[in-house]
């Protein structure tokens, strides 16, 4: 199916979501097999994690959830806009324990542009530094007075 999509549509990007209890590592292996014969580059492995359910999912879905977290190059936390700092920090700690090298996006995704999310997924931007720079620039005139 992936080969047909690539050859028919020539997409710039293909997103594959391992639904249900699929493993990210299995999806990655399958795509790597197809990539041997097609112009396909695996450049990011992203997991979206609900900040309110990380602990519960680790407990209830164990191997499958841990596989998605441990094989991700980027983990985007959802529902952070209404979560406390403590809840976000606890989720980050649990995720970082399973995958200390992944970029973990904690910014409420409703304030991020699609381009910012793609850049972070691709490992091309330091979103924290960028948002801090924007915040400083927005408050700079207020500090002068």
Residue ranges and their predicted role:
Residues 35, 76-80:
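Short amphipathic alpha-helical interaction patches enriched in hydrophobic/aromatic residues
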Residues 20-23, 51-55, 80-84, 109-113:
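Conserved nucleotide-binding/hydrolysis micro-motifs of P-loop NTPases
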Residues 67, 71-74, 82-145:
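C-terminal accessory "lid"/substrate-recognition subdomains
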Residues 45, 75-76:
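Short, well-ordered beta-strand core segments
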């Amino acid at each position: 199916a992936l080969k047909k999509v690539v050859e028919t549509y020539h997409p710039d990007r293909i997103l594959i979501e391992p639904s249900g209890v699929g493993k990210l590592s299995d999806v990655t292996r399958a795509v790597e097999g197809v990539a041997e014969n097609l112009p396909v580059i695996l450049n990011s492995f992203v997991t979206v994690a609900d900040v309110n359910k990380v602990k519960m999912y680790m407990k209830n879905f164990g191997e499958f959830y841990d596989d998605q977290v441990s094989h991700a190059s980027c983990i985007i936390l959802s529902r952070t806009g209404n979560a406390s700092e403590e809840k976000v920090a606890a989720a980050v700690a649990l995720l970082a324990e399973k995958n200390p090298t992944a970029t973990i996006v904690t910014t409420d995704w409703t304030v991020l542009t699609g381009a910012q999310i793609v850049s972070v997924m691709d490992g091309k931007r330091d979103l924290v530094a960028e948002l801090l720079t924007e915040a400083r620039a927005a408050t700079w005139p207020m500090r002068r007075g």
